[in-house]
Amino acid sequence: MSERKISTTVVTAGDRAFAWGALLLVASMRRNGMNHPVIVGMTGWTDDMKSRVASLGGVTLKELPPSRQCVTCQKPLLMMDDAIDTEWVCWADSDAAFVGDCTEWLCGANPDEIVIRRYDPPPADFTKENLAVWKRDIEKFCGGANAESRYTTRVNAPFIVINRKWKGFLETWNRQIQNVLPPDVEIIMKHGSPYFQTDESVLGSLLCFLPDAPKIAERYAANGSVDKSRYFAHFAYNPKPWQMWNSYSLKWHGVVRPVVDWLLENGRVKTDELPLALRKGWWPFWRALAPAAPWVWRATKLKRRLFKK
């Protein structure tokens, strides 16, 4: 990492199912010399997982308040935490890893802007009807809305960088999540819903219609568009690499394996403590199973739900 002063706190969160993801995320930072302070929101973690993540240093573990909403809906609550004393805050989803030293991408060029990726072209659910709902809800709960949307596409929020001067905006985002999303919402809603991507959609609505929202930065470099040796790798779709490998996630094996090896070499975890999907000897099996993984995963989840009943 460069010699400059650390000016960003990285924030992430996960329930029990994402604890290994959070460990991989923070480990990827430390492996690449990114010694930024990290806040991890958690719920349902074992003491062993808490110890493993804390052992990486500079990590504050915070038990999330009780909520029936998915963990991702607590993004703004964690990002505006009073314990953050850096100029910038970066949200990073816990199903991800940093490749290379990404220090440069953890700060914005302009404190008046939010760094977040925009979809281009707009997704199918970015309709006039959904925009009308966004505008209506901003008018209803926020005291007024822009006549027209600032943007013609919505945002993608696994990686966000914002200056701490926007704490009030984060508070508005948090309130609006409670205002417009169901109290028991999961990570996504019915396809076509104005708030299909839950907290991400709420954030998009504010950036489009809230008069005093930050502008979206034109430059988004965390996806490797500027430097392919330094980027934020987001493991989209289920199952996740620590659970089961699928055809999509196979491309991330070269990102995940070095982080797991680093954890082993530095005594942060033992081989027999790793999930089977992260054990080197099991890789041929998971690679062969990958095409069927989504169906196996759905069947496993269905079985768990049935037995809960």
Regions found by a protein language model. Give the residues of each.
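Short, flexible, basic/aromatic active-site loop/helix in glycosyltransferases
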Residues: 136-150
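Active-site regions of enzymes building and remodeling cell-envelope glycoconjugates
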Residues: 53-64, 76-78, 112-114, 230-233
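Conserved glycosyltransferase catalytic-site signature
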Residues: 72, 76, 157, 196-201
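A conserved donor-nucleotide-binding helix/loop in the catalytic core
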Residues: 24, 64-104, 116, 260
